[in-house]
Amino acid sequence: MRVIERNVRVGRIEIDLVAEDGEDLVFVEVRTRRGQDDLAAETLLPAKLQRMWRAAIGYCDRREIPPERIRIDAVAIDLDSNGTARRIEHFRGLEIPEPPPE
């Protein structure tokens, strides 16, 4: 995997990392928590993933990239109170939940 952009804004949404992994264009959300009881992975909420998906579609539309190449990943980093990583998890190819009916 090769990072090609960092902190990309698409409308009001910021994508932490955009990377290429073979034919996939990977949009990565990075979540970090320091010395807290909750885990960084627990903060990957469906609404955030839905916004990331919409941002990825917008990113690809502007660059005429087929949406079939999109992959959504997340990296969750848990730090101890000194800032040392105690857990790093990489979630590949997350399924994006359907938004609730209005």
Where are the regions that the model predicts?
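Short secondary-structure boundary/hinge segments and terminal tails
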Residues: R12-E14, D78
